[in-house]
Design a protein with these regions (language model features):
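Short, surface-exposed coil-to-beta transition loops
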Residues: 75-77
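Basic, Lys/Arg-enriched alpha-helical interface segments
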Residues: 1-72, 83-96
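Catalytic-pocket segment enriched in acidic/His residues
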Residues: 80
Length: 96
């Protein structure tokens, strides 16, 4: 379940508020990003995100240690911290 968002743009997108902040995201990834956030919200366990394999769930390292990501496409990721059975600080980020 999504417990909190890491930025207002991601929160606005998820809640259907197509604000100026949301316009920074490419239009072609919006539906896929929403679908991935719906999967994240439905997850009861981190392992639930291993399917489908296209999510490519991975634990991040370095400055992002403690965070995980799932892929939206080659360039964009949903990044979050999984604690207490939920996703915290959820953000849609350009990973490259």
């Amino acid at each position: 379940m999504i417990e909190s968002f890491g930025d207002r743009a991601t929160e606005d997108l998820y809640h259907g508020r197509f604000s100026a902040r949301v316009k920074r995201f490419p239009k072609e990834i919006l539906s896929a990003a929403l679908r991935k956030m719906d999967m994240l919200n439905a997850a009861c366990f981190l392992e639930d995100l291993k399917a489908p394999p296209g999510n490519k769930l991975e634990a991040l390292r370095g400055d992002m240690k403690g965070f995980h990501s799932i892929r939206v496409n080659v360039r964009w990721r949903i990044v979050f911290e999984w604690r207490g059975g939920g996703a915290h600080d959820v953000s849609l980020v350009d990973y490259h």
